[in-house]
Amino acid sequence: MQIVVATHNEGKLVEIRRILEEDLGADAENIELVSAGSLHLPDPVETGVTFQENALLKARAVAIRTGLPAVADDSGLIVDVMGNAPGILSARWAGAHGHDKANNALLLAQIEDIPDDKRTARFRCAAALVVPDTETGADVTGGVAADGITVHTTAADGSPAPVHARYAIKSETVELGDMPGRIIREARGEHGFGYDPLFVPDDQPAGRVSTEPDHEGEPLTSAEMTPAEKNAISHRGKALKALVPAIEALLH
């Protein structure tokens, strides 16, 4: 069975495949994960106001066009003292989408005067599985589900354009995962992306501490962990693992 991961980032596809294969076990052999990018599908406009809504929007956009089950995730950083910001705006907090250094610099400036014990935060991920109804089909513009959210992509002139739905939606599942921790005052580590160099998770790998100069012996940031160490505790790992029963149900 093919399942489409709603991303154009092949690195994310590899990460999601690794996480799911660990829990699917032998069932993993019966699933082929492909990316939306490899199918030349456009990115939908993320008009949701929560991680759950945006994850569903991305998965719906793929499922209603391809007739294949689709998995998508949406994630970001929630800083308690900032009223849960940057939240769904995490990737474009400083303005430009995906500009990690600018986002990190702005975040540090905004909480510069906050004492260490008040710099609590958490990464949150919503992971969605949308299954299309390939028997009924559809011939409508706009992938509308029970909550009334319509899927749009971007037209040539930059305006939102409703997605033409070739298939109706049969079922939807969305799960949440959190990784609690705190924000430190300077970046550490070479792995990961986004805010990983500033984030120290509460859960730490046994027997491992930072070896960075002036920080020897301190807990690791997400960016100092190996991919396997991070996946074992990550928000994305928790959310995707919670989706596994719904994915297994498609096979049996």
Curated annotation (Swiss-Prot):
Entry annotated with the keyword Magnesium: yes
Co-factor requirement: Mg(2+)
Protein's UniProt keywords contain Acyltransferase: no
Region (Disordered): 202-229
Pfam families (UniProt xref): Ham1p_like (PF01725)
PANTHER family, sorted: INOSINE TRIPHOSPHATE PYROPHOSPHATASE (PTHR11067:SF9), INOSINE TRIPHOSPHATE PYROPHOSPHATASE/HAM1 PROTEIN (PTHR11067)
Biological role stated in the UniProt entry: Pyrophosphatase that catalyzes the hydrolysis of nucleoside triphosphates to their monophosphate derivatives, with a high preference for the non-canonical purine nucleotides XTP (xanthosine triphosphate), dITP (deoxyinosine triphosphate) and ITP. Seems to function as a house-cleaning enzyme that removes non-canonical purine nucleotides from the nucleotide pool, thus preventing their incorporation into DNA/RNA and avoiding chromosomal lesions.
Sequence similarity: Belongs to the HAM1 NTPase family.
Entry protein name: dITP/XTP pyrophosphatase
